[in-house]
Amino acid sequence: MTSKILTSNVATVCGWWAGVAGALAVGAGLLESRPPLAVWALAGAAAAAGAGLAARARVLLWAACGLSLTAGCTLLMDVIALLFGQRVDSVTGAVTHALGLVGALLTGAVAMAVTGRRNAAAGAPTGPPGRWIPYLGVLTFLPYVAMKLHWALGGTFAGVSGAEVLAQSERNGASGLWLTLERWGLDATVLMALVGILLLFCLIRPWGLRLPRWLPLTPALIGTATLVPYGLLGLGYLVLAQTGAVGISSGAFRSEDDTLLVAWIGYTAFSGYGVALLAATRWYWRRTRGHGGPTPLRRP
């Protein structure tokens, strides 16, 4: 009975979300001359969610979940910018990203309930999905961390020096905190990567089960919903760019080859870590389901 009430409440909240998201998307489309692509994805997600809720159609609900992920997959970039005192590129875009992430969680939960996958009688897994998971996250991030630290320490990589990277950050309006860290030989994204690696270990190691459930799950869900689609879509685009099917701007780099090299390092890190985080989050979610506080540990 409790499960049915919870599912009904989630569906109700999802319906309200669809209304708010749809209204925002329509408003942005009417008021802005060139609304972000995420706005159109959010509009499609709201429409699919509304139709899916009315018909209890899991295909439409999963489509809404996918479109919501597309709309919200860059939310993490907005969060990082705000954490380091920077302004987001677009307020409309940031709100769209946040609504997209919330919508992905809501529509995904309702879709799972419709398909019967959320079975309260299902037993929780007895052990972590694999102790290799956090090490996968570490390995995929190592080249990225090395590249960013090399620049922060004044080195040159892909034809760009650390001084040029710092100057580019200043031109892009980086915050004082961000620039100060770079001058000290630290890169803000490297610090976030280290926090992310710690989160991976927290999700699958026994000491992580002693924490309140929401504490690791909140950043884990945000990271999973943003990094997995962002990283995988980025890799897909790079494959097309590498084969010449699409073009790629060299940007601050001296050649397209340099741009591709740096992009491969970045998107491999994001996608590899995102997949590892997805597996760890899924296990932690199932292992701690029904526990609002720390989970007691059983000795073998």
What are these regions (language model features)?
Residues 63-71, 136-152, 218-236:
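Hydrophobic alpha-helical membrane-insertion segments
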Residues 1-12, 115-132, 291-300:
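Membrane-interfacial, low-structure loops and terminal tails that flank and connect transmembrane helices
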Residues 2-107, 111-115, 281-291:
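An N-terminus-focused feature that recognizes amino-terminal "leader" regions
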Residues 53-66, 199-224:
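Loop-to-transmembrane helix junctions at the membrane interface
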Residues 8-11, 57-60, 89-92, 96, ...:
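Membrane-interface helix-boundary signature
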Residues 252-300:
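Extracellularly exposed regions in secreted/surface proteins, prominently low-complexity, repeat-rich
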Residues 51, 103-117, 138, 188-207, ...:
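Transmembrane alpha-helical segments in integral membrane proteins
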Residues 26-41, 73-99, 148-187, 233-267:
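Membrane interfacial helix motifs at helix-loop boundaries and amphipathic/re-entrant anchors
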